[in-house]
Amino acid sequence: MTQFDDHPLWQSSLNPADAPAVQSLSPVALAYLGDAVFELYVRCCYLFPPRRIGDFHRRVVAQVRAEQQAQILTTLLPQLTDPEKEWVRRGRNAATSTSRRANPELYQAASGLETLLGYLYLRDARRLDELLALIELPDAAPR
């Protein structure tokens, strides 16, 4: 478990009856949410010990870039269930545009990770915590 257990951030307001609504969301919409969830998680991990805002920002940006997210996905893949891998696949296939500096394959992998994180945020906060706890962030506060 992470230091953020029982924090409202990870407590989705959706109940099991909302499952069809979540299933109907596009992978792009889930990736949009997953991007925000992941960045907020990384920001929380680097919040302590206190740092200058520029150092804080550099550390966070280094972790939320497509290249790093693709590497994180590679690390997590062996731990994913088949349904989770399906969300990653859907996210990869839905990635439509890339930044000029990003390799398209890396961008697709990052989109797959973000899609999965967005889905888990809405449907399974405990599993989201489990997967986030597996991510090693350099120089982050102990979790």
UniProtKB/Swiss-Prot annotation:
The entry's cellular-component GO terms read: cytoplasm
Identify the main location: cytoplasm
List of catalytic residues: D35
Q: Which GO terms describe its molecular function?
A: ribonuclease III activity; rRNA binding
Name any one Pfam family assigned in the record: Ribonuclease_3
Cofactors that this protein relies on:
Mg(2+)
Q: Where in the cell is it found?
A: Cytoplasm
- Indicate the secretion signal residues: none
The family line of this record is:
Belongs to the MrnC RNase family.
Q: How does it assemble?
A: Homodimer.
According to UniProt, the name of this protein is Mini-ribonuclease 3
This protein's species is Synechocystis sp. (strain ATCC 27184 / PCC 6803 / Kazusa)
Q: Which gene encodes it?
A: mrnC
